[in-house]
């Protein structure tokens, strides 16, 4: 029964995290994928409060989960369901466009979460080899993932930094492709090339 509650907690947590991450990536996209503009958007009055509100239930579910007991774990699952509802996508004038860049950002974020969970599980197991590892590993992973959940608005920065070489390579490919096409037309008079 406890395993089932852990699975439900993890599933509801992940769905809430994915919905919140989609909102964050949408805002990053609205700011033209520019970290400086996105940072300025974060600092606008009300945005931090709104973002914290979107993470509040997931963050409150953590102490309940760490306390243990079926009642606390069930309450933690209910709070995660509230997180899912709070992060329900709203109608936007300009909705999130699932470009290849957005997909790469989502995959990179998922990999960061998986690495953080794996590292926390392994370190918890190494530190407390005498204890029941599943309980300690699960709680440690839950703690690390909950902290990451709250930090998602700023996790965009390292994700963007990790993906930056890929994005530059893609941009370089298109520039080189345009230069090649122009070279194939020797009689063409080039006045200017725009984006």
Model segments located where?
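Short, basic phosphate-binding NTP loop
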Residues: 5-192
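The Walker A (P-loop) glycine that initiates the GxxxxGKT/S ATP-binding motif of P-loop NTPases
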Residues: 195
């Amino acid at each position: 029964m406890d395993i089932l509650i852990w699975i439900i907690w993890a599933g509801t947590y992940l769905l809430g995290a994915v919905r919140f991450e989609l909102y964050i990536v949408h805002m990053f996209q609205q700011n033209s994928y520019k970290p400086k503009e996105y940072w300025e958007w974060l600092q606008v009055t009300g945005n931090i409060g709104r973002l914290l509100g979107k993470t509040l239930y997931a963050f409150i579910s953590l102490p309940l989960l760490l306390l243990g007991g079926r009642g606390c774990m069930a309450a933690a699952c209910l709070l995660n369901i509230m997180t899912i509802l709070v992060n329900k996508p709203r109608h936007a004038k300009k909705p999130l466009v699932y470009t290849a860049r957005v997909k790469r950002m989502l995959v990179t974020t998922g990999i960061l979460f998986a690495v953080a969970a794996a590292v926390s599980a392994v370190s918890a197991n190494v530190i407390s080899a005498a204890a029941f590892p599943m309980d300690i590993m699960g709680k440690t992973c839950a703690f690390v993932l909950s902290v990451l959940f709250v930090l998602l608005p700023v996790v965009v920065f390292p994700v963007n930094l990790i993906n930056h070489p890929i994005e530059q390579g893609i941009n370089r490919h298109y520039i080189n492709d345009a230069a090649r096409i122009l070279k194939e037309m020797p009689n063409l008079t080039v006045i200017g090339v725009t984006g």
